[in-house]
Amino acid sequence: VFFAVTTQLVLGYALAQAFMRDFPGKAIFRTIHTLPLIMAPIIVGSVWKLMTTPSIGIIPSFLSGWLGYDLNIGQSAMQAFVVTVIMDVWHWTPLVTLTMIAALISLPQDPFEQAQIDGAGRWQIFWHITLPMIRPAILATLFIRLMDAMRTVDEVLMLTGGGPGSATRFVGVHIFKEVFPRTNYGYGSAISVIVLYLTIVACWLMYVGLIAPRNREKD
């Protein structure tokens, strides 16, 4: 979960910076990039299931034909985990990209112009100006994605069913399998309450890191 969310933040920011520049076909690429975001999770899981099925999937055919690598997420725990992470990154990176674009557009240009006049490099501008100014957007996006990733169920069930073994049995999938197939309602409810408490803690951390500093500045 943390690896997927971190990857989404890095890719989302990089793509946001790319889309802030003008290049041929920019509108088309932005539209294509945003398409996964409007797809329901169960559809995403079904599409990736078809693409990764060894007999008919385009991804196993490409890897086997061009790289000599056999992909079978039904038998390899590592492959199933990696493909699940890639699917989640593909599905939710557009959300991070749109958030970062909105944050970058809202930044005032005066600090950047002054930094360039003073001879600051790109990395210096990023670390000392851009990153602190978009920190609220990064924190908000981080916690939203972490909370959402903790309850991911449908797309993982469609892709791997939580297997092989327990390789992709994430928190949401674990609760689902305990409650419905096994009717272990007490255990499932207990895990759900723990997830709820973790979500509350995440919201509190977001408040401390995002809202509280602004209130102190106003005071």
Predicted regions and their residues:
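A structural signal for multi-pass alpha-helical bundles of membrane permease subunits
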Residues: 1-219
